[in-house]
Amino acid sequence: MNNSATTRRISKIALQYNGNDKGTAEMVYSNNLLSDTAENQFQEMKAVADRNKNVKNWALTGYISPERSDENEISNDVLVELTLKALEKVGVTKDNQIRLDIHNSTKHKHIHFVVNRVNTHGQNTITAHKIGELFGQAVREICKNMNLKTDVEISKEKKEKMLENLQKSLGKASNFDELITEMEQLGYKVILSENVKVGVSGMRIVKISDINTETKRN
């Protein structure tokens, strides 16, 4: 599963974005937050973060995005469980403030998280150093424990399937245009790399269902 995590100082806009997603967002979990609105929850988080002046980038934000596949669709409950367990691996405790939102405006749902690194006792529980790498490792470990495919496994399977389909298409096509058509029929888009000096310099092949026309931001 694709994932990202970073530490930063946020404004209320981050929570508002996570809680909106063009009207499709669903808040699926919160912890140590009394308010229902993004703006008030930000004020709660900021008040707790201010208890530890040494922590400047007090928010841990990011997302987990499962593979875009109808047959591999996972439930909201499983996605929440996966996220909470991965967050626990990088230092999140029952005393941290957490908000999780599931977004549905893109081709496949994904979950966003905002966590206060400063817990309700004023202690920083999450180390910023290599947090993206550590969170990715945590997600892969939890995926294996929950019998879910990791991002590495999915990437390998997709590459093997693409090469198999490319071999089939090369056997049928007699020119490049036919190759593009054959691959398109199998669900792939062939994108040429071109420049003025050398013309076509290469190509890349992407699964059409993986092309995301929306710009996803944390």
How should each PLM-predicted stretch be described?
Residues M1-N218:
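N-terminal nicking endonuclease/strand-transfer module with a His-rich metal-binding environment
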